[in-house]
Amino acid sequence: MYHSRMPTASSLHVVLVHPEIHWNTGNAGRTCLAAGATLHLIEPLGFSLGAREVQRAGLDYWEQVDLRVWQHWEAFEEVLPSLGAPWFFSTKGRQAYWDAPMGSASGAVLVFGRETAGLPPQLHERYAERFVTMPMHSAHIRSLNLSTTVGIAVYEVLRQRRALAL
C-alpha cells in the first residue's frame, strides 16, 4: 500500500480490482463514506485519481473517503486476513449475495472486478467458495453497473449486521 488518507477502524471494506471508469469509483467512494467503509483500489486503474470526474462523482465528499491504493493484488492480499472475510462479487458466483453471511462482526471485505472483465481468473480459482452473485431476472443483462452493485452489497452487510444486532 502506498496511499492512505486517514486511519480507520472500519470492519467493512470495499475493494475495486482494476476499476476502469472514474464515475463508478467516485460513486463507490461516496457509498463507502456514507456507510463508514474503507475503499481499497487495486492498480492499475483506468483513470487518474486526480481526475476531475472522480471527484465530481464523489461530489465534495471525495476528500473524506477512507481510501487505500494498492499497487497490485498480492500486496493487498497480504493484509486481507486481518480485514475480515472476503466475498467476491461475480456473475459466475454460485450463491446469491443475500444467502452469504456477510454481516460478521469480525469484518467483511467486498471485492469487485473491473467493469469490462470482472475479477481475474486466479481469484476465481483461489477463492471459488467465496464467490457470490446478484441474481438477475432478465437473460438480456450481462451484469449490473459496478457502483450499483457496490451499493447493494454494502447495504446488505449493514442489513445483516442490524439483524444480528452487531
Each language-model region and where it sits:
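Post-transcriptional modification and biogenesis factors for structured RNAs
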Residues: 1-166
